[in-house]
């Protein structure tokens, strides 16, 4: 298994990252000019992964325990937690295996190591795709619940949600297998980037439309009760702030990784791009951070889920 940087991680085509020498320092590019390189200690990376793992396991356990949470909306949230769990778990597994290989605690044939590496890469890629898909699915579910409130339960039935979930998992596994097999083709990386942009646009359009409807509804209530307009403005500002945080976190955590893939396609040998490639593990760490934040945004805001979570913790 490769030993450092992107060679240690997803997509073997990103194999230009050299060994980091400090936690935060200046590394030299091909011309000797300094470029900023941030090294994430393995201990910190594993710790963040463990936090994400525990957090998402609790979400899955709480939803599985409470039958009142067995609705289409919570099914999507549960699958988001499961995919986030796999994202953090697969990265932790690969990091742990590499550390064992480096220390000599794990000795095996090169072919076995390479097969394990490919399997982990497929798991990582498919769980990332699933995570993005379920973020989009949650946005669609909330959009339908607002704009088709009276028909929501007939549109988003549990069997229909289960079929959508199965389709997402199957498509993600098949796609990731193809992506890892043909990782050295630029079209593969571009497909991943386009998919991320499509999810970003989908979420932005749906949530902005939902915010506009919520502001319109609040304005109607204010007019009905003959209140002053500052209340409506305050509601609009709170909604805009919430939307900015939601989309901002998504973009900041996932964007650098897909920017990295874009640069691999368009400027693999450029000096500036080579400096960015050195921080590949930072981009993966941001994705792990997103898997920690997702439950706070989508799961723990539910009072019913928090109550069930307390029961789960007390039962242990």
From Swiss-Prot:
It is found in: Cell membrane. Signal peptide: none annotated. Belongs to the G-protein coupled receptor 1 family. Gene3D superfamilies: Rhodopsin 7-helix transmembrane proteins. GO terms for biological process: adenylate cyclase-activating G protein-coupled receptor signaling pathway. Residues 1-37, 94-118, 184-191, 267-279 are extracellular. Keywords: Cell membrane, G-protein coupled receptor, Glycoprotein, Lipoprotein, Membrane, Palmitate, Receptor, Transducer, Transmembrane, Transmembrane helix. It holds the Pfam family 7tm_1. Residues 64-72, 141-163, 212-240, 301-316 are cytoplasmic. Coiled coil: none annotated. Interacts with MGRN1, but does not undergo MGRN1-mediated ubiquitination; this interaction competes with GNAS-binding and thus inhibits agonist-induced cAMP production. Interacts with OPN3; the interaction results in a decrease in MC1R-mediated cAMP signaling and ultimately a decrease in melanin production in melanocytes. SUPFAM superfamilies: Family A G protein-coupled receptor-like. PANTHER family: G-PROTEIN COUPLED RECEPTOR. This is Melanocyte-stimulating hormone receptor. GO terms for cellular component: plasma membrane. It comes from the Eukaryota. The chain crosses the membrane at residues 38-63, 73-93, 119-140, 164-183, 192-211, 241-266, 280-300. It comes from Saguinus geoffroyi. A lipid is attached at residue 314 (S-palmitoyl cysteine). It is a multi-pass membrane protein. One of its GO terms (molecular function) is melanocyte-stimulating hormone receptor activity. Glycans are attached at residue 29. Receptor for MSH (alpha, beta and gamma) and ACTH. The activity of this receptor is mediated by G proteins which activate adenylate cyclase. Mediates melanogenesis, the production of eumelanin (black/brown) and phaeomelanin (red/yellow), via regulation of cAMP signaling in melanocytes.
């Amino acid at each position: 298994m490769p030993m450092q940087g992107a060679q240690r991680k997803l997509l073997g085509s990103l194999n230009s990252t050299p060994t980091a020498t400090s936690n935060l320092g200046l590394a030299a590019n091909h011309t000797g000019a300094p470029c900023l390189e941030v090294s994430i200690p393995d201990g910190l990376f594993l710790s963040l992964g463990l936090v994400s793992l525990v957090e998402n396991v609790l979400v899955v356990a709480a939803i599985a325990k409470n039958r009142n949470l067995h609705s289409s909306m919570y099914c999507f949230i549960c699958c988001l937690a499961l995919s986030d769990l796999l994202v953090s778990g697969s990265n932790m597994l690969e990091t742990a295996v590499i550390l064992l290989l480096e220390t000599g605690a794990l000795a095996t044939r090169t072919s076995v190591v390479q097969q394990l590496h490919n399997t982990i890469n497929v798991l990582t890629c498919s769980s990332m795709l699933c995570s993005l898909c379920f973020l989009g699915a949650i946005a669609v579910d909330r959009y339908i619940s607002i704009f088709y409130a009276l028909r929501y339960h007939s549109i988003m039935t549990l069997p229909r949600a289960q079929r959508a979930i199965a389709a997402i998992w199957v498509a993600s596994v098949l796609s990731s297998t193809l992506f890892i097999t043909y990782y050295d083709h630029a079209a593969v990386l571009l497909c991943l980037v386009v998919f991320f942009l499509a999810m970003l646009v989908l979420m932005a359009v749906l949530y902005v439309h939902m915010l506009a409807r919520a502001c319109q509804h609040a304005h109607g209530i204010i007019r009905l009760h003959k209140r002053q307009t500052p209340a409506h403005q305050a509601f609009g500002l709170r909604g805009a702030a919430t939307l900015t945080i939601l989309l901002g976190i998504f973009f900041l955590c996932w964007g650098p990784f897909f920017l990295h893939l874009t640069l691999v396609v368009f400027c693999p040998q450029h000096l500036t791009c080579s400096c960015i490639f050195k921080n590949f593990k930072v981009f993966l760490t941001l994705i792990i951070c997103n898997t920690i934040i997702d439950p706070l945004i989508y799961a723990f805001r539910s009072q019913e889920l928090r109550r069930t979570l307390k029961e789960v913790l007390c039962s242990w």
